[in-house]
Amino acid sequence: MGSDWDEIKRLAADFQKAQLTSTLQKLSERNCVEIVTLLLEKQLLDVVFTVDGKEYITPDHLEREIQDELYVNGGRANLVEVSKALNVDLSRVVSLAERIAAENPSIHLELGQLIDEEYITHIAQEINEKLALRGEISISELASQFDLPSEFLQHKVVEKHLGKIIKGRQDTTNPRVFFTQAYIQRCKAKIRGALAAITRPTNVAVILQQIGVQEKIFHSLLDEIAPAGQVTSKMANAQYVPHVYAKTQSDWVSSFYKQNSFLEYDAIQKLGISDPKTYIRKQFPSEEFLFLKRVALGARLVELTVVTALNECSATKQYLDLSSILPSNLSEEDIEEVFAAIMAQKQSNPSNFVYLDSIVFSQPYLQQLVQPCQALAETQAKAAIDSGIYQQHIVEKTLAQKGNSSAQDLEDDGKVDKRDERRKKAASGKAGGGAQGRETKTKSTKKHARGRAAAAQNDSDDDEDVHQNTKGGGGGGNKKTVKPLELVKTADIVKLITATLEEEGLEHLAKSIASLYTSQFNQTALARAQELFEATPQTNRRQTHAAIQDRINTLLVDIRLYEKGLKLLPQDTQTQLVKYLLKSLGNDICNELSLYVAAECNLTVKNSNLNVDQRNKLAQECDAQYRSALLEQNKALNKSIDEFELATEAVLKACSMIIKKVDKKKDRLLIADHKKKLQEQLLECNDPALLLHLAALILFTTISGCILHASGKFVSAILQHIRGSLSDPQNALLLRYHDLVLQVLQSAADSSESKIAHEQLQAMQTEVIDLAQNYSRASVSKAD
């Protein structure tokens, strides 16, 4: 136990000795770096390294050094400069600066700068000194001077110390402007003095330039000053008008109007008034004005002088010189405008007056003045008829009006006609042979005196086609115009009225007055000439009426006789012959009546051989009394013969023509005459095809006692019909002749076959002619 106690004492002595003993151990730089690195890795130590990495410092110490830099720089330190001075990375400086600004309300971080309250107080004192010196200052100027944000300066500096350090007040209209009361008083004094010295309208910009006051302060203080005048607006071109000048203007305008009863806009504008009409309305609110382009007339002047004088002029049937009752300052344009305005207001009837060069004529006065021109119009109309001028004008006018709209159509239709005729020519040249339906090309028979329409459909005269095309072609697309016919000219009227006007001193208006009535009297003369023109040809028209009536009746008798003959043939052939009959003789009847109606309606038609389309167009241009009847007649050409005759009767009735009663006693004479003419043509014929055609028609008439209107393509049908009435040698002769004609037409003209066939036809020609001329049967008398 004792030994243990001794051991304890010994150890205590050693410990005390160790405590009392001081030992110094120096670490190397490498050891220090390793120790610090180890502490950093174990997050037992937080340090900030310098930029070169050779030194480090704790964040707390760095924060104290940043605050020291802020103090050293007078309360405003740029963090970039602080970073360079402390040799520390800028990001660590910015981070600590943000913490400093957040923890300390008296320190602010703005645009990378630390600013404390001492610096803010300092710049507030500078702002106060500047404001006291200038009297007015703006935040934008301070921001430029101190290189600080305008919001920071306004809220954290100026407004915070306004009324304390900064002695001034804030502009209510512009919170970014501050000024002193003394400055406001000085501006008021300048404005008041300048406005008091002005005696005429002056531009506000000129006033501000002279007194050195800003425009915004001028307008804000103007109401407080209450000057003896007014500013026209707050725009850049505003003017200040003193009351003394406005009163002078008002007095001058009132005096001028009282003396003259009108106001000139130019005179008012010379007073400095930009809108004369508005000023006049304000100046005379109870007065009524007639506002013209150049002047404003008082309503009393217009009512008491002009309107009264016009009514008197109308009542006395005279004329009025407006320039004598209106102010002499008014020009002729002003006077004309006054007259037009009065007429527009319907204070007088406009139709009662005519205005010419400030002179107003009543209509009765002018009617009396030009009364002698009625006789002139009558004389000129008669002279135009006697000389033929009017007739020539009618022809030219009709050609222009109708030609422009239909000449091209008629030309095109003429071309269609030519193609139709060529097709018919080709069709008419074929004739059937026996039961095999062989056809022979023949020419159409010549038209006899009564059946003048028979050749219309068979016409193959190429020269006539060329002639028609020549007349219709060329220039069809060029629009023609006819100069209006002037029977009464302005110069003629001037000669008649000049003497009367000279007595009144108005001869200078003679031409103007004459031009007003030239058209009227020219129309009167033209109407009278038309009456004379219509009365002149009545005798000729009656003769034409009778001649056409006879021709139509003759054609209707022919159609009746031809219809009787075609009914002897088979039904299918009858239908074709009816169609052919209407397209030939029926077409002629339609043409005759259409041309007659066109003449009655004063329409000019160049081509007398019209087709259906041309007649329809012509009917549309005719008077209403003819139109429907002509259109129905054209439609009936494609129907039966009975329907066509009914339609023709309607047209004849519209034309005041009559249809002669049927006299069957004359039918035998007409048939004999027709046969005789066919025989005459047969004797003169040398063409084999035409000779066969004529022979067939003559034999048909001899055998049946009826006449037939048929083209060459019906020859085979006719031969088939008369076959039973002929002997076998006669049938063989006609059939052989028909076959040879067909052979000639089908072979080449210079071939040997054609020559042989032609020689055989020449040899047989006499026999065929003799058969047609001398054939007779027991039931047919020699007279037939």
UniProtKB/Swiss-Prot annotation:
Tell me the leader sequence span: none
Q: Which GO annotations describe the biological process of this protein?
A: protein K69-linked ufmylation; regulation of proteasomal ubiquitin-dependent protein catabolic process; response to endoplasmic reticulum stress
* Region Disordered, residue ranges: 401-481
Q: Which InterPro entries match?
A: Ufl1, Ufl1-like_C, Ufl1_dom, Ufl1_N
Keyword Protein biosynthesis found: no
How would you classify this enzyme at the top EC level?
Answer: transferase
> Recorded E.C. number(s)?
2.3.2.-
Q: Which GO terms describe its molecular function?
A: UFM1 ligase activity
A GO CC term attached to the entry: endoplasmic reticulum membrane
Q: Name one Pfam family in it.
A: UFL1_C
Arranged from A to Z, the UniProt key words for this protein are: Transferase, Ubl conjugation pathway
In the UniProt record, does the keyword Transferase occur? Answer: yes
Alphabetical list of PANTHER family matching this protein: E3 UFM1-PROTEIN LIGASE 1
Q: Which family does it belong to?
A: Belongs to the UFL1 family.
This molecule's function is given as: E3 UFM1-protein ligase that mediates ufmylation of target proteins.
What's the protein name? Answer: E3 UFM1-protein ligase 1 homolog
- Native source organism of the sequence: Drosophila ananassae (Fruit fly)
At the highest ranks, the source species' classification is: Eukaryota, Metazoa, Ecdysozoa, Arthropoda, Hexapoda
